[in-house]
């Protein structure tokens, strides 16, 4: 498979097609946006500074694939990705999260992403170090070899001095190698050992109330270098110790300065921030009520989307080249209700179409992570073969579509509630049913859902 940087916009859309049904225009827009980033990297330095990303505004009802398109694109490109709700933020000066926090969160995600990649690179070395630490706990040197007391040294030092004969050392090494062999064969996984770990203490976290968690984290990080690191001995099985020690030993092998440097570069040049529910902060200007704060959030958002420098605990971060994708249903408000300056910062507008009954059929069958494939995989662990007939799939799609028309339209999310109700009995009885092949056809779907669908009160609560 090609690396992402070599993929054309058409190939990016084809990859997104594996997970998201329809919405071609939205896929096309994001594919062009990320491809332009790769093109920008190939430009001379003076041009690179001038070419800014074209931010995208997605307009469409809930459950049609807005978030999923952005998330899958980030996974495909290996970009740091953050999803935020515009309604979570408050204007500077009000209690709540400031919009600046989204950049800090993106950098944190980027650092963790790069750190995990570097840990993967040194995993083999870390496994060897973990093996040594487990062997130290299984065969402690002091217990493996007897103490030989030298009376002359005792007179000088005033205490006992451990001295080991060559024979003692040979026996110790032989015992250690014997245990190493057993460890590698997996014979000691349930053996209990005692290991020493550094205790992580966050004394400031409990002081700060809701909306001030960021401040608590910053103060904890600031004082973490000054506070003494407490060590605590813990008893655990070898299998558990391996999981605990592996990331600790791997972290010692990686250069955190290089990790931070690469993470900052990745966040600044490849970061994607998805701002959901932007329609909820749009509205006509008003001097009173909640609209004041909404206008304030838009004004606070503007410099970040335009390009500014935000201070984070890892260093300053420029937001000029971060790709912002905003999304909203815009049932009540319109994109023109956003402040004009913010409208201008989202030049690419894409309208996502509501899902049809035929789309629901395709969503159930086609994506690589399709709902029915997930249930088939889950129940196969109990030895149950789950078979969906074509008419069964179409009946589930029909009912989901009808419910969306009658009740609140929640898009493809309705399929999850319908599928869960259809397969509830099988999921419950799976370990005990004698017939391990279950066929889900239209008759089966109707039998499971008919009463609930007909009773509007029931369907409003259950489906």
Swiss-Prot record:
A biological process term (GO) from this entry: protein unfolding
Pfam families assigned to the protein according to its UniProt record, in alphabetical order: AAA, AAA_2
GO cellular component: HslUV protease complex
Localization (cell): Cytoplasm
Binding positions (ATP): 21, 63-68, 276, 341, 413
Subunit structure comment from the entry: A double ring-shaped homohexamer of HslV is capped on each side by a ring-shaped HslU homohexamer. The assembly of the HslU/HslV complex is dependent on binding of ATP.
This protein's name: ATP-dependent protease ATPase subunit HslU
Upper lineage: Bacteria, Thermotogati, Thermotogota, Thermotogae, Thermotogales
Gene that encodes it: hslU
